[in-house]
Amino acid sequence: MFGNGQTGQRLPAMASPPHDSYYSQSLASSRSRNNSDAMDIYAITDRDPPAREPSGYSQWYRNGSPSVNSIHSKSSEKQPFYEENGRMYHAYRKGVYMLPCDEQEQDRLDIFHKLFTVARVSDGLMYAPHPRNGRFLDLGCGTGIWAIDVANKYPDAFVVGVDLAPIQPSNHPKNCEFYAPFDFESPWAMGEDSWDLIHLQMGCGSVMGWPNLYRRIFAHLRPGAWFEQVEIDFEPRCDDRPLEGLAIRQWYQYLKQATQDAMRPINHNSRDTIRDLQEAGFTDIDHQMVGLPLNPWHQDEHERKVARWYNLAVSESIESLSMAPFSRIFNWDLDRIRRISSEVKSEAFNKEIHAYNILHIYQARKPAN
């Protein structure tokens, strides 16, 4: 059923896809939801409703790791959020980050966390080798759901999450700490050669310089430790019909252009990612791809389950992804943004349109010597 798309074979979500491995030897040569599966975000994520408030800003020292308290903006702590076009955004380096951070956005991020677990056919949280009592760092942790789940699963581990927006819950495990606002694109020192795994999820659209970020990540990992990155390529693909002229295709082109103009492109290129990881010094790079159908048109039950989750995630994402880029970069009014968002959602719900996106998972190791 899956033919060759623009970037190669589209891999079904229900299968464990083959891996593209790049080893060192080769280097020389709305709150209202209609989907009954997800009516209660706290039920689907298996956690209690958190108090949505910033966590404390305690200093921490462990295995030589310095305090990160100096990166906090005093002005943003006094006025951490501001409203724009009916959505709330964090005020740290106001206007730079394109995504909101209100309750609707926090629910969206938690839905994606669940989606990734379903799509990868595993309840694992980390797929690269790691010690059970290790030090784990989550860059751009969002609501902190991944960090909290890791801390609960590995009570002897030490888990840190950092993010621009202070939206993490205060009722987190004792072995888990959060620091926000924290800009991981600015210079940071959190203990070089000290982390057993660094995790980054959905960074596209937020990062200006991937090569510099990968070099910082490389420096902070222990020798032999791993970096894991999860990204979605939002470019719509379809194997049985062209998408030209459809709103979903036009919307992506607008979003791609706006985020490129803002110098934080949301478009994802796996070849560039692998090249940047290699140039940063990583070896044993593993690349997996998983297909994400936009609606449950497929007959396979697992594929349909993935599609239901992704349909919910996309329906929550279209306006969130569009509002700031289209209003700030293109000066569109709200009516125009909402109109194209509604058209995209309608096509995403249409089972006659067999469109999909691609989930990319990377694992890369810092050499042991």
From Swiss-Prot:
User: Belongs to which family?
Assistant: Belongs to the methyltransferase superfamily. LaeA methyltransferase family.
Regions of biased composition (Low complexity) lie at 20-37
**Catalytic activity annotation:** L-methionyl-[protein] + S-adenosyl-L-methionine = S-methyl-L-methionyl-[protein] + S-adenosyl-L-homocysteine
Q: Name one GO biological process term.
A: sporulation resulting in formation of a cellular spore
Q: Where do the segments described as Disordered lie? A: 1-37
Q: How does it assemble?
A: Component of the heterotrimeric velvet complex composed of laeA, veA and velB; VeA acting as a bridging protein between laeA and velB. Interacts directly with veA.
Name-wise, this protein is Secondary metabolism regulator laeA
Q: What does this protein do?
A: Methyltransferase that performs automethylation. No other methyl-accepting substrate has been identified yet. Component of the velvet transcription factor complex that acts as a global regulator for secondary metabolite gene expression. Required for aflR expression and subsequent aflatoxin production. Negatively regulates veA expression. Controls conidiophore and conidial development. Required for hydrophobin production which plays a role in cell surface hydrophobicity and host defense escape.
Query: What InterPro entries does the record tag this protein with?
Result: SAM-dependent_MTases_sf
List, alphabetically, the PANTHER family matched. METHYLTRANSFERASE, PROTEIN-METHIONINE METHYLTRANSFERASE LAEA
Q: What Enzyme Commission number does this protein have?
A: 2.1.1.-
- Protein induction: Expression is regulated by the developmental regulators flbB and flbE.
* Name of the gene encoding the protein in the UniProt record: laeA
A GO molecular-function descriptor: methyltransferase activity
Q: Where in the cell is it found?
A: Nucleus
SUPFAM superfamilies from the xrefs?
S-adenosyl-L-methionine-dependent methyltransferases
Show the Gene3D superfamilies listed in the entry: Vaccinia Virus protein VP39
Query: What's the superkingdom here?
Result: Eukaryota
Q: Which Pfam families match?
A: Methyltransf_23 (PF13489)
UniProt keywords, alphabetically: Methyltransferase, Nucleus, S-adenosyl-L-methionine, Sporulation, Transcription, Transcription regulation, Transferase, Virulence
GO cellular component assignments: nucleus
CDD domains from the UniProt entry: AdoMet_MTases
Q: What happens when the gene is disrupted?
A: Leads to decreased conidial production, loss of sclerotia, and altered in host colonization. Reduces expression of hydrophobins rodA and rodB, resulting in a decrease of colony hydrophobicity. Impairs expression of aflR. Abolishes production of aflatoxin. Leads to down-regulation of nitrate metabolic genes. Prevents metabolization of host cell lipid reserves and is inhibited by oleic acid in growth assays.
